[in-house]
UniProtKB/Swiss-Prot annotation:
Claim: NAD is one of the keywords in the record: no
Protein's pathway: Purine metabolism; AMP biosynthesis via salvage pathway; AMP from adenine: step 1/1
UniProt-listed SUPFAM superfamilies: PRTase-like
Keywords recorded for this protein, A-Z: Cytoplasm, Glycosyltransferase, Purine salvage, Transferase
Gene Ontology molecular function: adenine binding; adenine phosphoribosyltransferase activity; AMP binding
Subcellular location: Cytoplasm
Organism, as annotated: Wolinella succinogenes (strain ATCC 29543 / DSM 1740 / CCUG 13145 / JCM 31913 / LMG 7466 / NCTC 11488 / FDC 602W)
Protein name, per record: Adenine phosphoribosyltransferase
GO BP terms: adenine salvage; AMP salvage; purine ribonucleoside salvage
Record family assignment: Belongs to the purine/pyrimidine phosphoribosyltransferase family.
InterPro entries the record matches: Ade_phspho_trans, PRibTrfase_dom, PRTase-like, UPRTase/APRTase
Gene from which the chain derives: apt
Function in brief: Catalyzes a salvage reaction resulting in the formation of AMP, that is energically less costly than de novo synthesis.
Length: 182
């Protein structure tokens, strides 16, 4: 069960609320809080991902701040592997490595603890987040995993905003899996 059928896709899509004109006019914001507070939808998603990734022999799940933490921590617990947060600059308390990425107007950075994978070179890491748009943050996250001597076995996203091209950008760095392409 590693591919959703059309009914399962629709079930998940129906559990995600669209907020028009947020955070600015013309944007259709995908609000996953409605999926998170629906125990059947959230449970189905985590069970589906657990089934998919059980065979990957993972060492860690890495989640991108902040919604990637929700899915990543739940999935890591079910898979009985470690969870590694990838955070915005200045949010992690110990020694970090950082990766810059471009925004519409400027740059931002994400960080990971330098010893996130407990110095186990080649740790098998799944990267997860709720959504991929332009791919800048996800691309930086894959590079961070590599810089910390991990191996990103796959990058997983619940939603892929296809027209923005981020999935293609990230798939050049790591295998990619998206559940819902919209």
């Amino acid at each position: 069960m590693s591919v959703l059928d059309e009914n399962q896709k629709q079930f998940l899509l129906d559990s995600i609320r669209n907020i028009p004109d947020f955070p600015k006019p013309g944007i259709q914001f995908k609000d996953i809080t409605t999926l998170l507070n629906d125990p059947k939808a959230f449970g189905f998603l985590i069970d589906f991902l657990t089934d998919r990734y059980a065979r990957f022999e993972l060492d860690y799940v890495a989640g991108i701040e902040s919604r990637g933490f929700i899915f990543g921590a739940a999935l890591a617990a079910k898979l009985e592997v470690g969870f590694v947060p990838i955070r915005k600059k200045g949010k992690l308390p110990s020694t970090t490595i950082a990766e810059k990425y471009s925004l519409e107007y400027g740059f931002d950075e994400v960080e990971i603890h330098i010893d996130a994978f407990r110095e186990k070179e080649g740790s098998r890491v799944l990267l997860i987040d709720d959504l991929i748009a332009t791919g800048g943050t996800a691309e930086a996250a894959v590079k961070l995993i590599q810089s910390a001597k991990g191996h990103c076995v796959e990058a997983c996203f619940l939603l892929n905003l296809e027209e923005l091209g981020g999935a293609k950008k990230v798939s050049n760095l790591a295998p990619l899996y998206t559940l819902l392409d919209i």
